[in-house]
Amino acid sequence: MENQTGWPDQLFDVLKGADIRQVGYVPDAGHARLIARCKADNDIRDVVLSTEEEGVALAAGAWLGGQRAALLMQSSGVGNCINMLSLIATCRFPFLTFITMRGEWAEFNPWQVPMSQATEPVLTAKIGRAHV
């Protein structure tokens, strides 16, 4: 994977440097390059999820098993995680997620707009803080 350019490659390097060993995701065009990099790396277990909330449980299980995990999702996926996000605050484990935003300027799908507007408030309410 030579000629690295762009944020997906930079983020991949950060994940590797932080010893992230599991990456969960629902297939997403916004994260396609990052997903491809994770799949190609034998040190990272890429986990295709049925729904984003499974990624919260994946991260918890990884932490309990002595590994670090990350969840990749779209802003609409945050809505799918609302109940499961309580696990993070209650059990106080670290949670790393990277969210591609939908429903912002020039969004072609109006159904994406409400969750886009709610993403940061939901994360703040459920886990106490969100770094955007």
Locations of the language-model features?
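Thiamine diphosphate
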Residues: 1-129
